């Protein structure tokens, strides 16, 4: 691939690097969440997000980024973001990285469902079929009714549910506020919520805790910056399918770091979810 044949090359490259950074972040969080509460980790992440928002606002020369034109939607989306993050990071405590990410990758599909319900957007019959097929992939992974069913798989499913609602709220909020404002409130409200809950679910800090915290913040901000950079170069519709690359990193890092090997059901379920998701993205943007 070269920039002449594909003008979005750098955008695609940046988004792939962003998901690599998020993949490393989640690998670190999987270990960190064994020793710290979810809220402690998320407080660090949202605090870094808050500091990062000042950098982005200054870089883009946006002065009144701290003023929202619709606080109701803004606060709602931030609460949804916090709920999604809580469930997703919690899932790392009980599940393999590949399982958590594969189930979590249902969120783009759920987004289309909620777009139909909440935003009243039209969805074609072929898209509905792809949505149903993607749920078959989830059922294949979860295997309800079978003795080996793992109830902890419901945790990333809840994360996918809240993340899809967060995306809906973000789309609504984008009509009133710019990206710098949304990033600022994500960090501010997320920090406040997780700080309060950290007090009630506090776990003693260790000598290595601050190493975890630094790397969590570093890789989160790196991924966030690369994601923003990618979206500034290429349309979201072009970049959306590359979201699924994080499943590859989850499988790879899960195997290398935690000796996790996905079973055949997880692999087939992942293929079904990814294929359905890519079809929906491509078909809906024609």
Language-model-detected regions and their locations in the chain:
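Glycine-/small-residue-enriched transmembrane alpha-helix faces in small-molecule transporters
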Residues: 1-40, 148-172
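Hydrophobic/aromatic residues within transmembrane alpha-helices
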Residues: 32, 41, 91, 97, ...
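Membrane-interface helix-cap regions at the ends of transmembrane helices
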Residues: 2, 49-69, 136-148, 190-209, ...
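Helix-helix packing/entry segments at the starts of transmembrane helices
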Residues: 100-106, 173-189, 224-255
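C-terminal transmembrane-helix exit sites in multi-pass transporters
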Residues: 88-90, 107-129, 201, 248-267
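Loop-to-transmembrane-helix transition segments
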Residues: 9-18, 57, 63-87, 151-159, ...
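Hydrophobic transmembrane alpha-helices of multi-pass small-molecule transport proteins
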Residues: 126-142, 265-284
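Transmembrane alpha-helices of multi-pass small-molecule transport proteins
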Residues: 35-83, 162-165, 185-200
């Amino acid at each position: 691939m070269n920039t002449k044949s594909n003008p979005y090359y750098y955008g695609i490259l940046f988004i792939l690097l962003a998901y690599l950074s998020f993949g490393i972040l989640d690998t670190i969080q999987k270990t960190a969440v064994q020793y710290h509460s979810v809220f402690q980790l998320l407080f660090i992440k949202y605090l870094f997000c808050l500091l990062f928002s000042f950098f982005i606002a200054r870089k883009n020369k946006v002065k009144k980024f701290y003023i929202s034109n619709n606080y109701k939607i803004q606060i709602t989306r931030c609460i949804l973001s916090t709920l999604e993050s809580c469930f997703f990071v919690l899932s790392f405590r009980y599940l393999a990285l590949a399982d958590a990410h594969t189930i979590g990758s249902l969120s783009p599909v759920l987004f289309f469902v909620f777009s139909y319900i909440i935003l009243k957007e039209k969805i074609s019959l072929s898209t509905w079929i792809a949505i149903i097929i993607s749920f078959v992939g989830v059922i294949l992974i979860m295997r309800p009714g079978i003795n080996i069913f793992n109830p902890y798989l419901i945790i990333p499913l809840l994360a996918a549910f809240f993340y899809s609602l967060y995306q809906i709220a973000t789309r609504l909020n984008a009509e009133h506020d710019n990206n710098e404002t949304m990033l600022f409130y994500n960090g501010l409200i997320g920090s406040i919520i997780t700080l309060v809950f950290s007090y009630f679910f506090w776990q003693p800090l260790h000598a290595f805790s601050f190493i975890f915290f630094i790397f969590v913040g570093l890789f989160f901000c790196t991924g966030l910056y690369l994601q923003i950079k990618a979206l500034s170069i290429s349309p979201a519709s072009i970049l959306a399918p590359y979201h699924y690359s994080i499943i590859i990193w989850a499988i790879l890092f899960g195997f290398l770091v935690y000796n996790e090997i996905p079973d055949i059901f997880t692999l087939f379920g992942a293929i079904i979810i990814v294929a359905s998701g890519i079809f929906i993205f491509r078909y809906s943007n024609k």
